[in-house]
Amino acid sequence: EQRHVLRDEIFPLNVAYNVYLSASEFRKAYNFEKTSADFTYEASREAEAPGREIYVYIIGEASRAMSWELYGYERETNPRLSQVDDLVIFRDVLTQSNTTHKSVPLILSSVSTEEHDQLYRRKGLPALFNEAGFETWFISNQSPQGAMIDKLARDADHLIYIRSPRHDMQLLDEMRRIVETAPAQKMLFILHCYGSHFSYHQRYPREFARFKPDDDVAISREHAHTLRNAYDNSICYTDHF
């Protein structure tokens, strides 16, 4: 316990430790192709569907349950989802991390936080579906960073980064184009959204400015109401998406 306190809480020891930790994680991510090369899920299909199969896996970003109407929020931020019959809502779910670069790789893999080191030895969701005979697409509205998200995404048959990322509806436009033109019968699409990341005002078109004022303002207490409006508008846009 004393070693933990020295390492994590006392300056400058914590700086040196975090530099070491970052370098170690970078090295593991850099070597991912080698350390996961022999991994297999041994996945296969036991039965064939009669028609075309299209599965869509959507990864949202920076979206809080407390700002969703479906979870009891007082504002109507989920007008479309609220009208869906037989919608399955998970109410007892926690993210394994509150940062994108830590949580999304876990979402894309079979690894949990308790076995985080296995992340660098196992392939992710695209590889699993590839083994089962699917053609896979990873379409992202975020720029590549060379981190574990991109490493896992490269296992997809097709990796597409939207140029000049703006609004997430571009992901659906790209997916529709592929569905209409690709001959594949078994398809998996993983769509990585920009979601509700700051600056909130830029995350949705003007016609989705349901709550106003929603000006593009700096983060400060005096702008809290405006920022909340813009954030809630971004949730509404995700609902439309």
Regions found by a protein language model. Name each.
Residues 2-57, 62-218:
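Active-site-proximal alpha/beta segments of enzymes that process anionic O-linked groups
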Residues 56-57, 234-241:
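Metal-dependent active-site segment of extracytoplasmic phospho-/sulfohydrolases and closely related
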Residues 106, 218-229:
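Short glycine/proline-rich turn/loop motifs
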Residues 113, 160-164, 225-235:
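Surface-exposed cleft-lining segments at the edges of enzyme active sites
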